[in-house]
Amino acid sequence: MPRETATEKLIRMTEIERSLLADEGVSSIAGIDEVGRGPLAGPVVTACVSIPLSRLVLGVDDSKKLSEKKREALYPLLLENAEYARTSWMEPSVIDEINILSATKRAMEECAAGFTGGMILVDAVDGLKLPVPHRSIIRGDALCYMIAAASVVAKVERDRYMIQLAEEYPQYGFERNKGYGTAEHIRAIREYGPCPAHRMSFIKHFL
């Protein structure tokens, strides 16, 4: 079976958006995704991104499927072509206080607060209070262009932050693990104890 071309992928990943624009008459569509729900350290970051269909950037996919180099190349192009792009961060202290799901929802609501277009597509999160109608789509970051674009923006910003954080706390290897629970990271927590970037509710059984 021949490999899907970049143009074919773009057409496939915008099927939902094009259908909504044509059939339901919405003016524009944004996507929301999050990065960092599972790590032991660092914030959860959400992004809300809307790009006109006439200005779509080739190569967008679920951020987990893209290399760091590819994500970094896409990031400025997405921001340059977006009609709306905003991120929101919830720090470990907030995650510990209200739990990761509530923190993720709060961040999603914050990043979408200024969007005044027609509809928002969300990657598999229900119960949000958003300014316009929205739909939750399972595996949205693999199926919907706008959600995938949001995943790239959120991933790049969070990864850059974790690399900076590694300069302040070099013992945990944040530049490599981005806060996720690798064997190296868990060993460092046990050896050095936690730092302010750690989610205490996530690491208490390692202490």
PLM regions: where:
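RNase H-like, Mg2+-dependent phosphodiesterase core
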Residues: M1-L207
